[in-house]
Amino acid sequence: MKRKTMIRTFACFLLAGGLAMLSGSCSSDDGNGGAPMIESVAAAADANLEPITVGYAANMYVIHGSGFSTTQKIYFNDTDTYFNPNLVTDTDIFVTIDRDTPYADVSNKLRVVTKTGEAEFDFIVAPPAPGVHSFNPINAADGQEITIYGSYFLNPTVTVGGNTATVVSSTLTEIHAILPAGSQNKKVTVTTISGSAEYGTAVGTAIYDDVFYSPWDIESWNNHVYVTDLSKAAQGTTFIKKSIEGWGNIQGNWNWNDQLSGYTGIHFFLRSDDPGKLVWIVNGNGWGNDTHAITTTKDWKEVRLTWAQLGNPAALQNISFQEFTGSTHNYYLDNIGFTVD
C-alpha cells in the first residue's frame, strides 16, 4: 500500500469511529492467505507516517505490511496487546501499546500472529522521559561519586554542565556516577532514549541536603528531628521536622560566609502536614514581617530569594523561620542552599 493510501485509510478509520469494518476505498487490500510480513511501523498521529523503530506506551501506531487480515495476537516485548479487529486490514493494523508494557531487559520485538503464521520486527518500547528527584551529596568534589535518585533511568548517560560523568552503575530508579572535572556550581542532567531531565540544584551549593555543611547547623535546643524517607524527602533521603507552636520558630546557627559572588541568592524547600505559614528570617531580618510569609501545604514548595530581595548582604550569617498562623503545625525543611541562576 502506498503511503498516501495509508493516510486515507487512517482517515477512514477516524470517520468510521472504529465501530465498523472498513469498506470501499478504506478496505481496498484483500488478504492473500500468505504468512504475515511487517514492513514498517509509524506513529498514527504522524500525518506523513514516517517509519520508526521506537515507540511509547499508551500511544497508537500503524503496523504496515501484508497478510494481516486474520490477525489473532499482537505482542510488544512479549506482552499480549489488545487490538480492535475493526482497525485491521490485510496491509495495516492500528494498535495502541499497552501502558504496562515492559521496557527493561526485554526482547525489543514486535510480533504479529495470524491464522497463517507469525511476523517479527525489531521495535523498542521506550520508557517515559527520565525524572530526577535529587542527588547526593550535593557538595561532592570533582572525581567523587554521587547517587542520583529518580525514575525511568534506562541505559542513562549523565552530564554535569555539559561534561560527561562516568556512570558506575544504574537501575531504573538510581544512578551511581563519578563527577567530571569542572562540576562545581554546575547542574546534573540525566539522558535516556526518551529524553533528558536536569536537576535544579547545582553541585557544590548546599547548606543542607541530608546533612548540614560546616559552618552551618540547626542547634539541638530547637528540638527538631531528622526524618529519613526517600519517598517523602525533597532532596536526597533525609529532611528536617519540627512541631512549631503558634508564633514559635526554628533557628539556624549564627556564622559568617562572605564568599557570595559565585551565587545569585539562596533557596530552601518547605512543607507542612496541613495548611501553615512560615516567615523567613535571614541575618536576623524579618521577624514578624508578613511580606516574608510563605504559605505551606503537604506538598514541597521551593522558595528562591535573590541577593537583591535579601538587601544585598555582605555575608550570609543566619537562616531561621517563624511560625505565622498562631497555631501549632508540623513543619518540614529540606534542600537549603545557594542558587546559581
Task: Go through the PLM ranges and name each one.
Residues 104-115, 185-194, 317-321:
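Short, aromatic- and glycine-rich surface loops/edge beta-strands on solvent-exposed regions
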Residues 226-249:
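Short carbohydrate-recognition loop motifs
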Residues 268, 302-337:
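Extracellular beta-strand ligand-recognition surfaces/modules
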